[in-house]
Design a protein with these regions (language model features):
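Extended recognition patches within non-cytosolic domains
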Residues: 1-32, 39-40, 131-133, 138, ...
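Beta-strand-rich, repetitive solenoid scaffolds
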Residues: 36-37, 77-79, 87-92, 98-102, ...
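Short, aromatic/His-centered strand-loop micro-motif at the edge of beta-sheets
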Residues: 99-121
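Extracellular glycan-recognition modules
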Residues: 40-98, 130-133, 206-207
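Short tryptophan-centered beta-strand motifs in secreted/extracellular beta-sheet-rich domains
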Residues: 62, 117-128, 139
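Extracellular glycan-interaction patches encoded by glycine-rich segments
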Residues: 163-193
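Short surface loop/edge beta-strand patches of beta-sandwich-type extracellular domains
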Residues: 38-58, 105-113, 181-185, 220-227
């Protein structure tokens, strides 16, 4: 109205006609994160199952808030026993995202990630069977596909050959996943992690893990419990302070904790910050 005062009946009618401003969907509210401190070499470790769903297809999704910059820091790595082959995802000393798989990937973004007050969402979706080389590794940051990578002397400019078996997806009872460190010592993570997911056997769409809030335009998390995780898949929401490595995927792929305690459970998450 001209006076700026609306009568109750007018407001009701405007709501019915979808003309009254209302709060947009807020997305899934993440309760907890896990704090990794490089000073105490915090990490999570799990022996992989003997039979993975696939060594050619898989998807990693996680939210991360960095604490320290300009050092090599491993987010996740796979230790392949009795062999020097391995795969890992990291930030390098220049704060680029970097993925290395010794069966055929060396990719580093041109973008840098240096905002220690921000939560970043990374999705790394793999499928080596695809005909288009650059589709075999799809990287998304906050819902947007990243396509600008540093020049590489490796074949395919750092992208894998078709139909390779990714080391980072390889199972076996003597193989191990490490979150927060490389399979050997060093390059420890100094950051908060939330909603850490691995899907064994599928190159998932980024929209399986997040969505843009229709009112704010901000990328927010989605519920992932309805996804199919595969034999070695896992979902770590970090909601059990007494067992921060507990897997909630239904696959019982729990991680053992190394130097992490209940004090490392945090309420600083991608939903609150």
């Amino acid at each position: 109205t001209a006076s700026g005062v609306f009568k109750l009946g007018e407001v009701t009618n405007l709501i019915k006609e979808s003309k009254w401003p209302t709060a947009g969907p807020q997305g899934f509210q993440v309760a907890n994160s896990c704090r990794f401190n490089d000073g105490s070499s915090d990490s999570l470790t799990r022996s992989l199952g003997a039979s993975e769903t696939s060594t050619q297809k898989g998807t990693f999704s996680y939210w991360i808030k960095r604490s320290t910059l300009s050092t090599n820091q491993i987010t996740i790595s796979n230790e392949v026993a009795n062999d020097n082959e391995r795969g890992y995802i990291q930030f390098n000393t220049s704060d680029n995202f970097r993925m290395v798989d010794e069966n055929g990937i060396v990719l580093a973004t041109n973008a840098v990630y240096r905002d220690t007050s921000a939560w970043y969402h990374f999705v790394i979706a793999l499928d080596s069977t695809l005909g288009t080389t650059t589709d075999r590794v799809k990287l998304y940051v906050n819902g947007v596909r990243e396509t600008s990578f540093q020049s590489s002397s490796y074949f395919n400019n750092g992208f894998p050959n078709q139909n390779i078996n990714f080391d980072i997806l390889t199972g076996g009872q003597t193989n191990k996943n490490h979150i927060g460190k490389i399979h050997s010592s060093g390059s420890d993570l100094d950051a908060y992690l939330a909603e850490f997911v691995y899907i064994d056997g599928t190159q998932n769409a980024v929209t399986d893990f997040g969505e843009f809030n229709s009112q704010t335009g901000i990328w927010v998390p989605k519920v992932v419990t309805g996804l199919t995780f595969g034999n070695n898949g896992f979902y770590l929401p970090f909601t059990n302070s007494g067992a921060l490595g507990e897997d909630f995927s239904g696959e019982d792929n729990d991680f053992s904790v190394n130097n992490l305690t209940s004090l490392d459970q945090s309420t600083d998450t991608c939903s609150t910050n």
